[in-house]
Amino acid sequence: MVHLTDAEKAAVSCLWGKVNSDEVGGEALGRLLVVYPWTQRYFDSFGDLSSASAIMGNAKVKAHGKKVITAFNDGLNHLDSLKGTFASLSELHCDKLHVDPENFRLLGNMIVIVLGHHLGKDFTPAAQAAFQKVVAGVATALAHKYH
């Protein structure tokens, strides 16, 4: 559960409506793979991840980023029940994919960075604080099934 004030909820909703989620997802995942190269080990099947330009132009990175942002959007629609919303994804990433749960926090930070880039001056410090709460809540929900 994420506790947002009414003003924070309004800011998140308003700004999210301005976002091209296809672009944000691919860019956020791409940045994660560039900035934290050890995360590439989870994406062996994605082909060329040899450089920043290869990663940022990789169609599989962009496609998976779109899936990530689609799930994130689902979380935005269920802020009061994030653990339930992300239960199956948490289980998948824990039991089958064996993803280090710290990576969820890192990806959340990449999402916030990309939002700042795309939204410019509209992404005020208060809006950033609200989105940081959201990505922290999503990261916690995704890590919920870890033992």
From Swiss-Prot:
Entry binding sites for heme b: H64, H93
Domain Globin, residue spans: 3-147
Keywords linked to the UniProt accession: Acetylation, Heme, Iron, Metal-binding, Methylation, Oxygen transport, Phosphoprotein, Transport
Modified residues (Asymmetric dimethylarginine): R105
Domain of life: Eukaryota
Residues recorded as bearing N-acetylvaline in the entry: V2
UniProt entry tagged with the keyword NAD: no
An MF annotation (GO) of this entry: oxygen binding
Sequence positions bearing N6-succinyllysine: K18, K60
Effect of C14G: In allele S and allele W1
Positions in coiled-coil regions: none
Pfam families according to UniProt: Globin
Tissue spec. comment: Red blood cells.
Family: Belongs to the globin family.
Function: Involved in oxygen transport from the lung to the various peripheral tissues.
Note: The D-major sequence is shown. See also the entry for the beta D and P-minor chain.
Complex formation: Heterotetramer of two alpha chains and two beta chains.
Name of the protein described by the UniProt record: Hemoglobin subunit beta-1
Gene: Hbb-b1
